[in-house]
Every structure is written in C-alpha cells, then in structure tokens.
C-alpha cells in the first residue's frame, strides 16, 4: 500500500503496474472461460460500468451499471448463446487502461446460427478491480445471427 495526497487529504491506495492490470484482466477472462461468473464479479467494484454496442435483437447488449447488472449480462449471454471460441490474443496496457485484442465465435441458441468476430475490449483497472469495460466488435454479424431463423 502507498499513501498519496488527494485534495489535501492522505489516502491509502494500491499502486498497480500495467503488468498487474493485465494480470487482473487475464484472471477475469480465465474466470469467464471456466464459467466462474462469481469469481469474475469479485474482480469488480459495486459501481462497475459495462458497455457493449447496442445490437438489434441481442437481449443483453447495451450499457450496464453496477455489479448486479453485470451479473445479469452474463446470465443473458449464457441463456442466449453458446461459446464456441473465445480467444483473447494480445494485451496492451497504458496507465489504468488494458486493451485486449482477440477473436470469438458464438452460436445463438434461438436460431442455431453462428457468428464470429475479432474484438477489442477496453478495460479500466483501479486498485486491482475492473471498474469499466467497453467492447468493440462486428455488430452486424451478431444482429444477423440473432435475426435469422434456423430454417432460413
């Protein structure tokens, strides 16, 4: 722990290196891959923000605020699609930001359709916790997979 001064008051805080922040993100991904959603949520404060693009027909897309809302996001992901591939491949960190570049592939349970995309995930990490997340991905591919019927 380190003590820093903020607005004339001393505050204890944990100074995290960029490599420490990458390790937090990698731990979160490992929890997700193992289905350990509680372990993933334990890496977030109560006031976490979680942002995916709005995608027509995708019930769990959009912005969420708070750990319970993020839990609902992961319940929605599990209820609506099957993970076929989830591969974060590169991690770049600067300050409190960690960017993960990777690729994933999903099957939509209601339509049977698959979609895949490269992604960029931008995490904000503070004191060893993920305080923010934003995803950049191929939204058109996901929308098509959710809108097609299995017979189409």
Give the positions of each predicted feature.
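Hydrophobic/aromatic beta-strand elements that line small-molecule binding cavities or substrate pockets
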Residues: 74, 86-91, 105-106, 118-124, ...
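A solvent-exposed, acidic/Ser-Thr-rich amphipathic alpha-helical stretch
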Residues: 45-95
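Short, solvent-exposed coil/turn segments at beta-strand boundaries
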Residues: 47, 94-97, 123-130
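A short hydrophobic beta-strand element
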Residues: 96-104
């Amino acid at each position: 722990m380190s003590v820093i001064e903020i607005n004339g008051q001393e505050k204890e805080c944990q100074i995290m290196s960029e490599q420490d922040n990458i390790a937090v993100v990698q731990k979160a991904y490992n929890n997700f891959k193992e289905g350990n959603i509680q372990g993933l949520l334990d890496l977030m404060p109560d006031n976490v923000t979680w942002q995916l693009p709005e995608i027509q027909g995708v019930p769990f897309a959009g912005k969420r605020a708070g750990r319970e809302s993020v839990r609902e996001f992961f319940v929605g992901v599990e209820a609506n699609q099957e993970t076929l591939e989830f591969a974060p491949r590169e991690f770049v960190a600067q300050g409190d930001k960690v960017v993960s570049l990777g690729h994933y592939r999903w099957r939509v349970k209601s339509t049977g359709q698959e979609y895949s995309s490269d992604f960029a995930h931008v995490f904000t990490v503070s004191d060893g916790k993920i305080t923010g997340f934003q995803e950049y991905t191929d939204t058109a591919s996901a929308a098509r997979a959710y809108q097609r019927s299995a017979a189409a």
